[in-house]
């Protein structure tokens, strides 16, 4: 199926239900990091920082992982292929976990490496990228740097990926990025909706690749949700990405992987950096994948703290999108920048701007219960009504 660049771009104009948001590139990603650094610089000296800005697991990895890391120091001088266990052992561990073949797996230095390589592998100047808005910015950032066309489809009224216009936009695309749960909105689509979406895209545009990113899979509590890994294994041009940065608490170790049919993910294998996972990360990942109890405990902990945080914000009149991650997308009724800076001045660092909702919404990661109780007190201080000169109550926040 041959689709020209002009044809791909024309589809954006002709789809009456599509809402296209200006693409965010590498410059925007760098600006996002600058926003986080700027907020942290406002934390007063001597105040213990509560960092709930980056969707990290506040407890870090479990004991089995820490023990595995400590045990690898004698092999720190070895390349990953010469260590025991090596990267092949990690691939085998993932294969065993999902009862699949090693050829169905590609390892990455975090799932971000895989996402970047997916844009390089599957998009071209003629066949662009389709993604949500807001959604994780990695893929559009790479596409913009490559000057490949991008269609960003605004989320629906429930802050979920808007599947109908995404299906229409996918015609002639090289890659569709389907973030499920979606970051930053934390919303999720059920298994049937995902399968229907993939089936429709396959019908409309058989050569288009669908990347289903399940970074927050382990936090989902919606009974309608299921991993798309079985779907990816039976369907050409579909693959799933996972990371150990979130529920496994290994954001600093940088381990991710892709799962799909061998012919689908082969281009990713060709693009990955040699020795892309360290000997420490390999050992840590193998230990983490074997520790199912730790993940169950982390899911339960996050669910309880998330419920507390939702209630605390709701009492302030701040509504959250239905969350199935370790973060919330919250309507604070004012620009995220103002809210972020006001919170930082009291020691709480929340998330960056997420266009097109940066004037009203903020992403708040879920910390420990103690952290979120303290953060809730700061939110009350920042968002509380203030008295006007005539004694009336104003809905404006107190930006202390």
Q: How should each PLM-predicted stretch be described?
A:
Residues 1-17:
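N-terminal secretory signal peptides and thylakoid transit peptides that target proteins
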Residues 26-110, 117:
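N-terminal small-domain helix-loop-helix segment of the aminotransferase-like
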Residues 62, 237-321:
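PLP-dependent aminotransferase class I/II
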Residues 121-179:
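PLP-dependent aminotransferase-like
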Residues 155, 302-303, 314-346, 366, ...:
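Conserved PLP-binding catalytic core of the aspartate aminotransferase-like
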Residues 163-171, 184-210, 214-247, 263:
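Active-site pre-lysine segment of PLP-dependent enzymes
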Residues 342-346, 351, 355-400:
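PLP-dependent enzyme catalytic core of the Aspartate aminotransferase-like
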